[in-house]
Amino acid sequence: MKYLPLSLALAAIPTVALANAEAPDPARIVVTGEGLALPPGTPAYGSVAIDRDRLANSASGRIESILGDVAGFQQFRRSDSRSANPSAQGATLRALGGNASSRTLVLLDGVPMADPFFGYIPFSALVPDRLSVVRVTRGGGLGAFGAGAVAGAIELASATRDQLPTFAASAFYGSRDATELSAGIAPDLGGGYVSLSGRWDRGGGFQTTPKDQRVAATAPAAYDGWSTNLRAVAPLSATSEIQFRGTLFHDDRTLRFKGADSMSEGQDASIRFISRGAWQVDALAYIQARNFSNIVIVAPTPTTSRKSLDQRNTPSTGIGGKIELRPPVGPDHVLRVGADTRIATGDMYEDVYSAAGVVTARRHAGGDQMTTGFFAEDDWTIGSLVLTGGVRADRWTISDGFFRQANGTGVGTLNTAFADRSDWQFSGRAGVLYHLGDAIAVRGAGYTGFRLPTLNELYRPFVVGSVRTEANAALTPEKLKGLEAGVDINPATGVSLSATAFYNKLDDAIANVTDPSNLNARQRRNVDAIVAKGMELTASGRIADFLLSASYAYSHSTVHAPGMRFDGLTPAQSPRHAASATLAWEPEQGPALSATLRYVAKQYEDDLQAYALPDALTVDAVARLPLGHGVTLIARGENLFDEKIYTRLGTDGSIDLGTPRTLWIGVRFSR
């Protein structure tokens, strides 16, 4: 990739920092590897935290499944990162409509993780046991990189040195000849530490196609992927440190037919400076080099299949950074001011094939976009009352967009250049948190936000089954307005209950709109609005050795599109009910057991509600047996009762299914 030299240059920085850092005084210097502390007004916006114990002990071992603990979290489809097309892994919250791009801002140590071209999240590269905590905030976001958080934010924090064993490794074997291997070391170095880890998982995959629809070309959803992560933290003074992270990943998958292969890969690097002195500082720079390819196979008869489209190369680059300052303004205020920028550039190359296997068209499309924002927020504590509020001003540009097409011999047939566009977008949020006592707090918040259409939505068409969805270079940004109110109750030590009522309106929502005269033809368009309102409930508690956590979301979403056939209907891929509950038995020593129940209500495949995906209820379980000397025997089970999970319904009657019963046995070692 063309930015590899810069990635390697960034990779050298932590080594130099570690080598040149002055020998620390252990009595004065504490390296945490964390960011700045959360402002006191953060709870006003409501959030759910997933702790490290849960992250390290799930049935699937995959972050997107664990995020399902937060009811209302969803990807575009119900598949996980072993059987989904990578470009469909957009993350969203609050049933704001199915969209393969992420409406939720996903951050890892402050770095936006969305693919620069597609907007999807590389979930397979986000290994849960490398993380310390995940905090999910539903609703509009602000602060650094707040542009893009129209459905909330998912903040992932890397595990700190005190959470990481010096050496850890695990090996699992699962159903359908699946293997999962991981290892990591985290030695102290100078006054800081380095963490190097890697994971490789592969499997023959399950049949996503129902038995009565399989043909000669049908193939299971095989997958093979790996990722490595290097993180280094070094002290610069008693109150400041520098943090580096580099991630490499590669992922190959097959979906539905032999030869229907997809590939995604990435090289990410970031460097972050944290100062916890009188003037607190959080400065960050990052670079991402990503690529994607995908082959579309059609099976016109039960005995034949052919390649119809080869999306052979989609290189993209993301560059960005931020600086946040917290000046000393007194003990009652936490003021944050700063700026951030994100630049995305990408190209799409694809070849179209005829029924005879001859290239009939070669397409090349792409463009650039940039968002630069300035923000200020303050939290003011007045006894039991916390007031919080902030504003953002973002300058966005969409430029150099084009779509070119040539015939099979290379003669140009189409050359379209799209006009550059730019504008300012202003956002704000405000919240209040009032503690009625030690056991109860009430809160309320209002917010606005926006999201630019991705390069993928603007310039790249895609095909799923017999349905082709066209891009739309004229798309405008989505804009959110929202209100919510809630209560948090802690009736006893270790027990917490929370309830939130919300109203969100997403204006100019980007949706895949079906052509009324051809159900196999869709186009991305801005619709008037999607309105989502509902209730979210969470609960957690520990009694003796038993731990219970639960979450439920009711989301009543409708599309406002006067004059359109889908006006008043539920947006695609938006279930009305979602729930999750985990019951665990975790004594301080000895064996441990946990079981997780998840429910997702009926949702529609399309905007016209012609194809309904039935509801699904699944049960997962994990059992751990310590064997001594740092070795633990682990058994995991996904979808234990083998529930049939529908992930897609095609206009031709074709069906895709999600993960069936999957069993794992393995060992984990840490020292």
Write out the residue ranges for each language-model feature.
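Extracytoplasmic beta-strand/coil segments of soluble accessory domains associated
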Residues: E64, G68-V111
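Signature of Gram-negative outer-membrane beta-barrel scaffolds
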Residues: V334-G437, L452
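Periplasmic-side early beta-strands and strand-to-turn transitions of outer-membrane beta-barrels
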Residues: L142-G143, E155-A157, D162-F172, R176, ...
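Conserved C-terminal beta-signal and adjacent last beta-strands/turns
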Residues: L6-A9, A186, A234, L433, ...
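Gram-negative outer-membrane beta-barrel transporters
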Residues: T381-L387, V495-D507, Q523-D607, F641
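Short acidic/polar hinge/loop motifs at secondary-structure boundaries
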Residues: V111-R138
